[in-house]
Design a protein with these regions (language model features):
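Short, glycine-/Ser/Thr-/acidic-enriched flexible segments
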Residues: 24-25, 40-42, 61, 71-72, ...
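General beta-strand structural signal in soluble alpha/beta enzymes
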Residues: 18-21, 28, 147, 250, ...
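Conserved C-terminal alpha-helix-loop-beta "cap" of PLP-dependent enzymes
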Residues: 99, 103-251, 255-259
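Terminal helix/beta-alpha structural elements that buttress the NAD(P)+-binding lobe
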Residues: 257, 263, 268-271
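Short coil/turn connectors at secondary-structure junctions
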Residues: 13-15, 30-31, 141-142, 237, ...
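Solvent-exposed, flexible loop/coil residues
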Residues: 6, 30, 60, 236-237, ...
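Conserved PLP-enzyme active-site core in the AAT-like
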Residues: 1-108
């Protein structure tokens, strides 16, 4: 929203309405968010929107959260776009530095991938590591990532990160790159496996029916053929391997094992 290419915001792209979380990368207390109405929203009356929110809202709201949103509004109006642009510049240089170091060590691909302006996505596979292994190495250097999976690792930055944070990450990753010995082979592409998973899934009932049905927990490998009741995702929001109401296939169970999903909730079968 505050970058020169701010047209990427959902409202600018035509959304009628969207909710922006304020507590991830802005100085807002957890739980704070902004509700935006676009020009094509079906309701434009602010009072009507507030009344609709009151249907599910509390009569005792957190004034601490609301106050933090008001304070954040002040920060956003006082030079925030320039600070944000400077942060993005730091990250662009960081990605370039990491990729140049990886290329110098003959890594089989770019280390820092193209991603959102405030995120650094690292392909740990080009270092011969899994994303979780790379996360452990960074944790030893007192750097905590936002997300790690069997291949990738994601870090998030804000304009409030001081310059030494960028330098510390660069130093830690460059040290790992320098330790590389011998050629690294990238794992095979998994696009075909995703396609196989999609083809094999079959919906047996609606999501609502599955979520409210009697359930039981089973080891993932024993759940093949059963109907998923509640999806298991490692880092919400995320794409579930199987959606509630779908039958769990061998391919789905294999993906659960890959992402370390040990148990899954299934609809209990009648006795």
């Amino acid at each position: 929203r505050f970058l020169p290419q701010g047209g990427q915001h959902p409202i600018a792209l035509g959304a009628a309405m969207c909710c922006d979380s304020g507590h991830k990368t802005l100085p807002v207390v957890t739980g704070g968010a902004y509700l935006h109405l676009g020009k094509n929203a079906p309701v434009q009356d602010e009072a009507a929107v507030r009344n609709a929110l009151a249907l599910f809202g509390s009569t005792s709201p957190s004034y601490l959260i609301l106050q933090s949103l008001d304070k954040c509004n002040q920060i956003l109006s006082e030079g925030y776009p320039l600070r944000l642009l400077q942060c993005c510049g730091h990250l662009t240089r960081l990605r370039r530095e990491l990729n140049e170091a990886a290329a110098a060590k003959h890594c089989p691909g770019p280390l820092a991938l193209e991603s959102e302006p405030l995120k650094v996505t690292l392909d740990a596979a080009v270092l011969g590591l899994s994303g979780t292994e790379l996360a452990e190495k960074l944790r030893a250097a007192k750097i905590e990532c936002e997300y790690a999976d069997p291949r990738y690792l994601v870090l998030m930055f804000t304009p409030d990160n001081p310059p030494q944070d960028f330098e510390r990450l660069a130093a830690a990753v460059l040290c790992i790159v320098e330790e590389l010995v011998g050629p690294v082979t990238l794992p095979e592409e998994t696009a075909g496996e995703f396609a196989e998973l999609e083809r094999g899934l079959h919906r047996c009932c609606t999501i609502r029916q599955a979520v409210f049905a009697p359930q039981e927990q089973l080891p993932a490998e024993q759940a093949v053929g059963r109907i998923c009741a509640m999806p298991t995702v490692s880092c919400p929001p995320a794409l579930p391997i199987v959606v509630s109401g779908e039958q769990i296939t061998p391919a789905a169970a294999a993906w659960m094992k890959r992402y370390h999903v040990e148990e899954v909730s299934v609809i209990r079968e009648p006795q």
